[in-house]
Amino acid sequence: MLWTEIMSGQFEKAVERSKGVCVMVVGCVEQHGHHLPLGQDVIHTAGIVELAAKKEPVVIFPHMYFGEKQGAGEFPGTIIFSTRLMLDILAESCSEMARNGFKKIILVNGHGGNTNLLNTFARSVLHEKNDYLVFVYNSWSAWPRINQMLKIIDSGNKKAFPELTDEDIEYLRYYLKNNKNSGHGDIMETAMTLGLRPDLVDMSKVNEVDGTSTHYISHLAKAGFYTPFDWMSSYPNSYASDAHEGNNERIGRTLLNYTVQRTAEAFKMIKEDTLCEAYLNTWLEKQK
């Protein structure tokens, strides 16, 4: 259920139907190679969330396109907000969800760079002693693993993935064997968008820029250091992937269907959970 499509007079019923669970997709507007749109993180994550919500009803708050992308302004179209503003937007958004009756809020993260930001925000809610819970769910937690899919196929259960042709399966074997770089604009992200919005993907440009790591300062990471340039210096084209020109809509729909089901199961888990709510209530009592 999209928040913006619910009539005001039906809102209380929507809260009841969702068991007080509201979901907000948090992404980023940035380059993902030359073959994917700038809004990739929200586009594919929101598509998954909306399909999952049809299986396991939750209310979906307007998406937050603006994520952590400091220092990447050289790519046209990138949108960069200050960290303070993003934290304020998250706080105000969650406050409004709670005011409207939602006591369980799931922030579905579609951008790897948001992970620390969202985890920090979730803990910051405790400082205000709010009576609602914030859960952070990284969207890629629900993605299938190609090696797991191939094991299922090799066990004689090819029917589990009815859309895949023999050529698709062989391509996935080839990619799994030869893949060295992934994580941004890669086979998985591209497949999700091919499954949802193939009109937004230009596979003729998938190899236009290099997606391999430069390992520019990887020696510092290996020594235990974090620097704000780790990822940017390793992937200066804002693309982290080996070539995956064999990717297609069939593979995309197959991966998408699995991900939607896993995401729906995650929503169900939070709807049915009572332990976190009980812990929060006990904790709030101790703070008085």
Model-based region annotation:
Residues M1-R84, D88-K104, G112-K288:
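Extended, histidine- and acidic-residue-enriched regions that form the cofactor-binding/catalytic faces
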